A protein has these predicted regions:
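Exposed beta-strand and adjacent loop surfaces of beta-rich binding modules
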Residues: 228
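Alpha-helical, coiled-coil/dimerization segments enriched in small aliphatic residues
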Residues: 126-129
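Bacterial N-terminal signal peptides
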Residues: 10-21
């Protein structure tokens, strides 16, 4: 499984702290006060001598526990010609380890009424379990065994079986799914050749076919070490006992070598690039992508608010205009998609019969120009912030969501509470001027306009006469296109 995580709050039990502004704070008129208090979730964080970071959060509302292990490695850590390894290794991690037979991990968690899975993005690979709290010790042992002893049981037969499964995933969800290759086309044309964000986490079929068991063993030795991992344990726990178990099962695992992080450059776009992708689809689709920012940027919160104003709900500007008022589109989406180092602001839409991608693009551009000129209304800001807060609180109901967020924030911000405090407060403090500013800064002429059209119908592309036609994005290079 692979996806990119949109950094909204996700978690479980919370405590809300109310703050009255001091006289000095009230005098700081240049800083907008947040409309909602920050969320406080109790946790304890510490680091073992081998570099493993541990985050514990006690919550006795249900007799369950979630365990999340995050490795700070994703598809951006791969190199051109060896793509798909991070996701493939996610599968390999479920093939057994030195003291755990193949299938036993799944059999145990499911047998006690729990569950487990993994996921991969550009930036991380995660593994999790949700189990009754009286099975926590065994779960920690299972995770420690595959962190420390996975290679003891990995052989070519197991590897080839998982490689075939991943190749089938690519066929099912990318190659043979409607619009399944759109973001592969976007990545290849938005970033320079060899850029770590230019390929999707699933990797290319050629690279998957060429991978060997020795390749993935090398990948494990590079990145699967305690000093590149964070473990979050959340729920019905005794913190003192949990610490003893973590020390028992993880403390003796060997620290890995220092991790070499890739040097990440900017997008290759200079001006507008237009691509027509002939695909096995029945209806065309328009996707407009602007280079934006990663999740460390101060502009991430206002861009997130802007995306919701444009396309989240029925009353969002683009959705309301195209789907409901003018009825020229069947669906619309707008989202700010940040990764650790780069980001993309995306708007896509599918036309109704008898309407065209050119019509959609024209109206989308008009709506964006309007918000760049006048900014959002006070009601829009209020509604979007309330919606984001409600969605966040709704997600704060499960141990697993909380564990995922605590692990994420520790791995990428060195603060398990970052999203619950800093990001939450910054988002609630976004002003109309902030939204107007980022709209003008990022939603300009430097963008990629992708028309996904049925095979043989390149005339259905938006402004087809200005667009370069592609049928195989991996072999037909468009890097030399001049905007």
């Amino acid at each position: 499984m692979f996806f990119s995580l949109r950094p909204r709050l996700c978690g479980i039990t919370l405590t809300i702290a109310w703050f009255a502004p001091s006289a000095d704070a009230a005098a700081q008129k240049a800083v907008a006060a947040p409309s909602a208090p920050p969320i406080r979730i109790p946790f304890e964080k510490y680091t073992l001598p081998n570099g493993l970071t541990v985050v514990l959060s006690e919550d006795h509302s249900t007799p369950t526990v979630a365990v999340q292990v995050l490795y700070h490695v994703g598809s951006k850590n791969e190199i051109a010609g060896h793509t798909g390894f991070a996701h493939m290794f996610e599968h390999v991690m479920f093939t057994g380890s030195g003291h755990v037979a193949y299938g036993l991990h799944d059999k145990f968690t499911e047998g006690v009424g729990g569950g487990n899975n993994g996921s991969t993005s550009f930036d991380w690979t995660k593994y999790y379990e949700t189990i009754p709290s009286n099975y926590l010790e065994t779960t920690l042992w299972l995770e420690s065994d595959r962190m420390g002893f996975l290679l003891d049981s990995l052989d070519d037969t197991k590897f080839r079986a998982q490689r075939d499964i991943v190749k089938n995933e690519r066929r099912q969800y990318t190659d043979n799914a409607p619009n399944g290759r759109d973001f592969e086309v976007i990545g290849l044309n938005m970033y320079p050749s060899g850029h770590p964000y230019s390929w999707p986490p699933i990797g290319s079929m050629d690279d998957l076919s060429g991978a060997t068991v020795e390749d993935v063993k090398h990948f494990f030795r590079q990145y699967y070490a305690p000093n590149n991992a964070t473990i979050a344990v959340v729920g019905d726990i005794d913190p003192a006992q949990t610490k003893r178990w973590i020390a028992k099962y993880f403390a003796d695992l060997q620290r890995g070598k220092p991790i070499a992080r890739p040097v990440i450059g900017p997008s290759a776009l200079r001006g507008e690039r237009r691509i027509t992708f002939e695909d096995r689809v029945q209806v065309p689709q328009l996707t407009i992508t602007w280079p934006s920012v990663g999740f460390h940027s101060a502009d991430q919160p206002p861009l997130d608010v802007l995306s919701d104003i444009l396309g989240l709900t029925r009353v969002a500007r683009i959705t309301k205009a195209l789907v409901y008022d003018n009825q020229i589109a069947t669906n619309v989406a707008a989202f700010q998609n940040p990764s650790e180092n780069v980001g993309q602001f995306v708007v896509n839409a599918t036309p109704r019969p008898e309407h065209t991608l050119t019509e959609l693009e024209t109206q989308i551009d008009s709506i964006i120009e309007h918000i760049k000129r006048d900014g959002p209304t006070a009601d829009e800001l209020k509604r979007v912030k309330a919606g984001q807060q409600r969605a966040s609180l709704e997600q704060l109901q499960a141990n697993l969501g909380k564990a995922a967020q605590l692990a994420n924030d520790q791995a990428f911000f060195n603060d398990p509470s970052y999203t619950f405090t800093v990001t939450f407060t910054k988002t609630q403090a976004v002003t109309a001027d902030d939204v107007k500013r980022v709209a003008n800064k990022y939603l300009g002429k430097t963008r990629l306009v992708l028309s996904n059209v049925p095979m043989g119908h390149v005339d259905q592309a938006s402004h087809a006469d200005k667009s370069v036609v592609v049928t195989d994005p991996l072999t037909e290079k468009t890097a030399e296109i001049k905007p």
